[in-house]
Amino acid sequence: MVVLSEIPGDPNEDNQNENPQEEVENLPILLQLPEELIASIVALIPRCHYPSLSLVSRAFRHLITSQELYVARSNLGFTEPVLYALIGFQAYTRPSWFFLRRSNFPLQLHRIRSLPPMLSGAAVVTIDYKMYVMGGCIGYNHPASSNVIVIDCRFHTWKYLPDMKRARCRAATGIIDGRIYVIGGCKKQDADWVEVFDVTTQSWETVPSECPNDANENGEFITYVVMQGRLFILDLECCFSYEPVQGLWESWDDGSELMRFWHSSSSCVVGDLLYALDLTCALEHPIVVYYPNELVWRPVMGVDTAHLPILTEYTSTLANFDGKLVILGGGDCSESSSEIWCVEIALETRQGDQIWGVVKSVSIVSRDLPMRHVIELCRTVMV
């Protein structure tokens, strides 16, 4: 089951029904322990239990919202994956962040109220517990933005980072060798079509590079992935890759094997292999996987349409959830139903290099989103 995260309440809020005397009487043993030891003990408890733990006392409420606890979780290697989704609604409405969480109820998708609405077409990457959100625009025919923010997913707080050198919307981005590369999202211009962000020095640098001739003039892309140390970019009529170490580009046209099934955002990379949703079942299965070394697509065995809810490719998104495959989406949002489903699929290799999938869970995670919502992207963060 995709058990993700629960964000506790504001530690500054006082419970009017609390009895301060009772709380003091319950704390002597706890207060005798070193704070570092307390944090190490609580760090071993899954985050989904933190809301219940916060009811014990003010001290616990403070602890589970402290940076020390998350440092302890990281040091102990007890971080957990959390799935985030950027969901937009009607045209010209800025999308908002949602995340999946579980407490004592079934898995549910919840809006993060502490984060402001994002720009549509923003490029997003994750590093540990942080999400970097770059560029975007309010809507079609609106100016692009060069703004960059970083979101701390432990506390759902955010701050601005230095702007990119160019304003970009629907750019491609990926992390290679610990640095964030951003490509396109603006009209082709060799001098600064590619930028790189150093997360240590918090600075942007232009990467001189010749634009691939096949890329569209506006530089707006459908989706992007990182595979084998290269940033693969899906354009409107072609796809291409960029290898930053040597600055090499490679292109594939619409008739290539790579673009046979890679034609929408319902795709992601797991274990350096590209997975895509193909509800036409051209290979007799709804999920296919691309082997870049062999330049061939194969079906993911063990998963059939009977195992999945009713989905459409343009309303569904794939994500790498800590080595598992997650499908977040639903059917035609123009119909009366606006349900969003979450499907978790474990992946394993059998019989040489054949990928098999095992459906671990299928659940409705939202029933009340507005009609015609669009899941722009999904990202997994470790917290």
From Swiss-Prot:
The organism's place on the tree of life at top rank: Eukaryota
UniProt keyword annotation of Repeat present: yes
InterPro entries: F-box-like_dom_sf (IPR036047), F-box/kelch-repeat_ARATH (IPR050354), F-box_dom (IPR001810), Kelch-typ_b-propeller (IPR015915), Kelch_1 (IPR006652)
Span of domain F-box: 27-73
Biased composition (Acidic residues): 11-21
Region (Disordered): 1-21
UniProtKB keywords: Kelch repeat, Repeat
Protein's recorded name: F-box/kelch-repeat protein At2g29830
Repeat positions for Kelch: 130-178, 179-224, 226-272, 274-317, 324-370
Disulfide links within the chain: none
